UniProtKB/Swiss-Prot annotation:
Native source organism of the sequence: Homo sapiens (Human)
Leader peptide range in chain numbering: none
Reactions accelerated catalytically: S-ubiquitinyl-[E2 ubiquitin-conjugating enzyme]-L-cysteine + [acceptor protein]-L-lysine = [E2 ubiquitin-conjugating enzyme]-L-cysteine + N(6)-ubiquitinyl-[acceptor protein]-L-lysine
Chain positions of all zinc fingers (RING-type): 131-165
Name of the protein this chain belongs to: E3 ubiquitin-protein ligase TRAF7
UniProt function note: E3 ubiquitin and SUMO-protein ligase that plays a role in different biological processes such as innate immunity, inflammation or apoptosis. Potentiates MAP3K3-mediated activation of JUN/AP1 and DDIT3 transcriptional regulators. Negatively regulates MYB transcriptional activity by sequestering it to the cytosol via SUMOylation. Plays a role in the phosphorylation of MAPK1 and/or MAPK3, probably via its interaction with MAP3K3.
WD repeat residues: 394-433, 437-474, 477-513, 515-554, 557-594, 597-638, 641-669
The organism's place on the tree of life at top rank: Eukaryota
Disordered, as annotated region: 1-37, 49-97
SMART domains: RING, WD40
Assembly description: Homodimer. Interacts with MAP3K3 and promotes the kinase activity of this enzyme.
Gene name of the record: TRAF7
Enzyme nomenclature, EC number: 2.3.2.-, 2.3.2.27
Start-end of TRAF-type zinc fingers: 222-276
Amino acid sequence: MSSGKSARYNRFSGGPSNLPTPDVTTGTRMETTFGPAFSAVTTITKADGTSTYKQHCRTPSSSSTLAYSPRDEEDSMPPISTPRRSDSAISVRSLHSESSMSLRSTFSLPEEEEEPEPLVFAEQPSVKLCCQLCCSVFKDPVITTCGHTFCRRCALKSEKCPVDNVKLTVVVNNIAVAEQIGELFIHCRHGCRVAGSGKPPIFEVDPRGCPFTIKLSARKDHEGSCDYRPVRCPNNPSCPPLLRMNLEAHLKECEHIKCPHSKYGCTFIGNQDTYETHLETCRFEGLKEFLQQTDDRFHEMHVALAQKDQEIAFLRSMLGKLSEKIDQLEKSLELKFDVLDENQSKLSEDLMEFRRDASMLNDELSHINARLNMGILGSYDPQQIFKCKGTFVGHQGPVWCLCVYSMGDLLFSGSSDKTIKVWDTCTTYKCQKTLEGHDGIVLALCIQGCKLYSGSADCTIIVWDIQNLQKVNTIRAHDNPVCTLVSSHNVLFSGSLKAIKVWDIVGTELKLKKELTGLNHWVRALVAAQSYLYSGSYQTIKIWDIRTLDCIHVLQTSGGSVYSIAVTNHHIVCGTYENLIHVWDIESKEQVRTLTGHVGTVYALAVISTPDQTKVFSASYDRSLRVWSMDNMICTQTLLRHQGSVTALAVSRGRLFSGAVDSTVKVWTC
C-alpha cells in the first residue's frame, strides 16, 4: 500500500495524523485567521471557485464539553470501521465515463433508527440563549403572550410559563434570538461521538473525527460535503462503510467492478487492472455504438408508449365523464317527466275538487234561497258582528292556552315564557299577577272549583289556589309534556303522548285513578261534556264514559291529526292539521259537514250558545279567527287582528278571548 493511502487510513488505526493531507495538485488554497475567543478559523477555497467554506478549526482552548441533543433531529451515523480492500463494482475510470456516475455522487448510510443529531458547541453559549423549560439552547425560538421566549415545542407542550405562571400561547417567531443562535459555532457532526449510554445521549468531541467548527446556521452546507461523512461503495452493498475522502482510493482497489456492458449480458467482475484489460477483449465493446442506438430507440419507444398510454387514459376519462353526463341527463329527463306527470295529476285532482266545491256551493245557495223563501233566516242583525275591544300585552313569548274563572272575572294565560299571567276582565283590565313555577312552556290550563291546574312541557301539573294566587302543589304527571287538561265530576284528565291519566281531586292533592291507553299519538284535545270525555289523538276522536272510563265510540277523520275539539248541544266539532273542521251529529255519530275556509292548522275551537243560535269560533295558524253559524254551517265572519298564529280560545259572558304567537291576548265582543 502506498504511503498516501497509509496516511489516509492512519486515522482509523489510531495513527498520529488527525487531519487530511491537502492535495496540492487540486489547487486548493487554505488561509488561517483567528475568530472569536482566539479560535483558529480556516478558510478553504477550491480552485474552480464553485464553492468556498469558512470553517473554524478546533483548538484546545476553544473545545467545549457542552452538548445539546435535540430529540427530533436527523439520525446519527454508526461508527466507521477501518476501510479495507473489499468487493466493489466500479472503477475510477468508470467514474469519469458517460455511462457511470460522478465521483461527487455518493450514497449515505441508511438510517436504521432515529437518534438525536449531535450538537456540541465550540464555546459555552450564554444562558440567555437557553430555554427555561428544557434548559437547552433555544430551538425554533418563539415569543409567547407573557413576553418570554421558549422553544416552540416546549411552548406547545407546557401549559403555563415557569416565570409568571401565565398560560402559554405562541405569538410570533423570535427571529433575533434565532439569528444569534445561528451565529454560534459548533463541531461538525462527523467530529462528535456519544459519551455514555444515557437517554437522550450526550455527545462529546471525537478527536478522530472532523476537526472543523462551523456556524450552526451553515451546518447543512458543510456536513453535506464533509470529507468525514460516512458513505457506501456505490458498486457493492457488501463493502464496509467508508469515509467520503477515502472513496476514490477504495474504488481504485475494488474487486467488484462490473463491465459497463453488464446490462447487455457481460458477466465480468474484477478490479481496476483487469477491468481495463477486459474492455480490450469484451465482445460488447465493439457493439457499444449499436447497443447505445438500440437503447436510444427503446427509450424513444418507451416515451412514445407512455404518451399513448396517457392519451388512452385521457380518452377513457373523457368517455367516463361523457357517460356520467349522459346518465345525469337521462335521470334529469326522467325526473322532469315524473314532475310533469305529478303536476298533471295534481291539476286533475284540483279541477275535480273545484268542481265538487262549486257543486257544494250551489247546493248551499239553493238551501239558503229555500230558507229565505220560507222566512227561516230572518233579518240581518248588525249587533251580531264581533269586534276587537282590547288587547292584553305582557307575555314575553307565544300564548298557548287560556282559561276563564267566571266567579272573579279573571282570565289566565299560559306562555312560552314559562309563566301564567292573571288578567282582570271586569274593572282594571290589567295583569293582576304573574305566576311562576314551571320550568317549561305552559301548554294547558284548567279550573276546578277554586283551584287552577296548569300543565307544562316540564311534564308536571301545578295546583294553584285562585283565592290568593299561590302555588300549593306540584305533581310529576307524565314522562312527556302535558298537552291538555280538562276537569269534570271532581276528576282531572291530563293528556300527553299516547296516554290520558285520570286524577281524583282530593283537596290540593291529585291521586292517580287510572290511565287510559290505546292511543297512538299525542293527545292534543280533551273536552268533557255532560257524562262523556272526548279525546283527539292523530286521526281519531274517542268518546269515553266518565263514570266507567270505558271507550264507547270512535270517530275517524280524514283531514290530518286532530288538534282541537268542541261540543255543542247537537254537534261534535273538531279542527285538524289539514285546515279542515269536521262536524258530526252528537246523537247518530254521523258526519254531517266539513267546514273549509282556513288555510292553516285549526289550533282551537270555542262555543257560544244562546237560546236563538249557536256559534262556533275557530282559531288557526293562518292568523285568523272564523265565526261559524251552526244553524246553516256557514262562516259568518272572519276576524283578522293578530300578527301571528292564533293558538288558544276562551269564552265568558258572551266575550271571546284569543291568544296568539304574537304574545298578546285579544278581547272580542259583539
